[in-house]
Amino acid sequence: RMLEWTRKRQKSGAAIDTAVKNLPLVRTVIVPENIEHAEYKHYLFVEPEYLKEGWTRDRIVEEISALGVPCFQGSCSEVYLEKAFDGTDWRPKNRLTNAKELGETSLMFLVHPTLTEAEISKTCMVIKSVVQSAQVS
């Protein structure tokens, strides 16, 4: 069952990547051929230099969500900022540059295996439409 679910998630993630492949505003994750991504969630990353004036990553999330497609602000890229790390030696003295950037630019989408092809198709259409609206020409 897990193999089937993974294949469905991978197919959904690939569909999202295909929908945005010619849109410079978002960067996809390039997975090396010798690695198999489980696609528990699917991420895209906003390239801020391509944002139209008045647009932000958070506005993209809001617009996609308003059109009925779940969209979130990504991962726990800087978990060390959580209260649990207060007063410990485990928090870095300076924020980690790459972790900060990933946290500030990530878009996270659901690709769980219970989603239908119609739902993934809608997801792709909505993402593409909103990204096109948010992207400089």
PLM feature segments, named:
Residues R1-S137:
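PLP-dependent aminotransferase class I/II
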